[in-house]
Amino acid sequence: MTDDSPVNLSAGLPETLLPAPPEEWAEDLARASTQSGPGRFHALRAAAGRHPRHLEAWATLAELADDDVDSYAYARVGYHRGLDALRAAGWRGSGYVRWRHEANRGFLRCLEALRRSAGAIGESDEEERCALFLYQLDPGMGANAGS
């Protein structure tokens, strides 16, 4: 009897790549993003409601919210949805989730928004934990975020 399983000889941490969201989700978010005025945020919220597992939608809401508590809430939803997605993709609580993989960016944006909004509402311990987690997931992200 032979074992045809691949052998991972890497001594480094594993890297997780989230699957790309369905194209219709991205298109829906893109349409919502083209709205102008107060209708834009409403359209983005509606898109998140139609596709609650779309991490980019939660990240966008967190980044655009005009209230720190709202930003925190949107970021936290995206963060927890992202943890669920990471686990489904094989992540076991450690290893890299790199910014260079576009499909990972929604989760990383949510985590960055959570870090920022936690600091804004005085949750400095959570802000520090999020900063450390971001560094552990992708030590080079600071230089790449936003690109």
Identify the residue ranges that each predicted region occupies:
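N-terminal alpha-helical interaction modules that lie
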Residues: M1-E56, L61-G93, E102, L111, ...
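Acidic interhelical loop/turn segments
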Residues: G95-V97
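Short, solvent-exposed interaction modules
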Residues: F107
